[in-house]
Amino acid sequence: FTDDGGSFMELARLDRGVASALPGFECRQVNYSEMDPGVIKAFHIHRRQTDVWFVPPDDKMLVVLLDVRAGSKSPNAQRRLILGDGHSRLLRIPPGVAHGVKNLGRSRGRIIYLVDFQFSADPDQTEEGRLPWDFAGADVWDVARG
């Protein structure tokens, strides 16, 4: 899949994918996405699906997380993180936490992500929900200076 801001592809669907570094997480699908500089992809939300994201150290992505879970102990909490930027780490995004990303780099940014549900276009089975990119305010995507 390709759009004005980049591309997305499914790399693999798995029947069993248990990683010792991710307790309680069984990978069912591996995805790869590229984003052009300055592009924002937001907000996605999943009812049951957990995402695990990896951004290569050579890239720099601003990730915004919003807790919109019903009955959450941290309702409407917002968190901004930088992934990549010389560091290697995984980000685990639980169900019900809206998430989006902005490529802060000068070249195409890459995300490899694992999910514990396989994509389905069937409206009764899909895990793909959306909120507007500016749901938390357009300024959430501004780069903090200082």
What are these regions (language model features)?
Residues 1-86, 104-146:
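Non-catalytic, conserved peripheral segments adjacent to functional cores
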Residues 86-92, 97-105:
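Beta-rich strand-turn-strand
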